[in-house]
Amino acid sequence: MKLNFPLRLLAAASLAAASMFAQAADVTVAYQTTVDPAKVAQADGAYEKATKADISWRKFDNGADIIAAIASGDVQIGYLGSSPLTAAITRKVPVETFLIATQIGAAEALVARDGSGIKTPQDLIGKKIAVPFVSTGHYSLLAALKHWNIDPSKVTVLNLAPPAIIAAWKRGDIDATYVWDPALGVAKENGKVLITSGELAKFGAPTFDAWIVRKDFAEKHPEIVTAFAKVTLDAYADYRKDPKAWLANQSNVDKLVKLSGAKASDIPLLLQGNVYPLAADQVTTLGAPTTKAITDTATFLKEQGKVEAVLPDYAPYVSAKFITN
């Protein structure tokens, strides 16, 4: 009898543990080094607490790699820009766009290196410009060249990931780059901003970042996607309620610096340069506006030879059902 009680207790504990693990889901989330308020929630473990999921956070340098990981099933939820998202959807990768993370403003820009001889857009002709291919930066670069009536064939566009851009910039191997932080911050140290994504948006070429999820994962774990979206939007609301007070909290800035690699002094400008849509905005945006933006992006990418065709309808790849007010 003395042995049975501990054994029964152990069996009960094992059953409880098994039940707990059965309820918890393993999910791999792909993130990038963009600066946004939700990175504080990421650093604080708020996503794990709200979703009750075992989350593995994986850092990626560009959206194209994230799409490849999602398509293979290695990643279930990912953060990427509108250009790689559009390219993926056009190729019918089974994903849903469930949250607009940011409408990109000053957080991405085209910078010309000091000493490159580039003072005006026309000076880009014959120069080397680095950008991660199929990224929002790539889309914006092509849109900027079109706006300035510069034939893309008259510049040398190099496909480099952000870490490689930083190295090439420091060596003086490239003349300009269209990129985001931390590479953007490095470029601005000895370079001139020619145009930002926010300015390009006014010329009819807006870009945005979004959170997407594999459709099969969303169907199996809708509660996780809903909780994930709520944590993100709560973080946005906390920032937008009083941006100055939020930035005055050094802990918030430190967490952004750690996860983004951006300089603390650049954080205010990067945050203020973007728009972080709240829940009410999401419900409206995750419909015709986003579908139209993706369609317009696909049309542009087809003109540039980056995708073979434009789908007749992108609505099945965009959903507001995971947004709770």
Language-model region placement:
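Bacterial N-terminal signal peptides that target proteins for export
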Residues: 1-11
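Sec/Tat signal peptide C-region and signal peptidase I cleavage site
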Residues: 18-24
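Short, glycine-/small- and polar/acidic-enriched structural segments
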Residues: 25-151, 156-159, 175-181, 197, ...
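Short, solvent-exposed loop/beta-turn-alpha elements that line the ligand-binding surface or hinge
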Residues: 48-52, 199-203, 277-289
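Sec/Tat-exported extracytoplasmic proteins
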Residues: 51, 74, 79, 89, ...
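Pocket-lining segment of extracytoplasmic ligand-binding domains
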Residues: 83, 164-257
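Secondary-structure end/capping motifs
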Residues: 219-306
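Hinge/cleft segment of the Venus flytrap/periplasmic-binding protein
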Residues: 299, 303-325
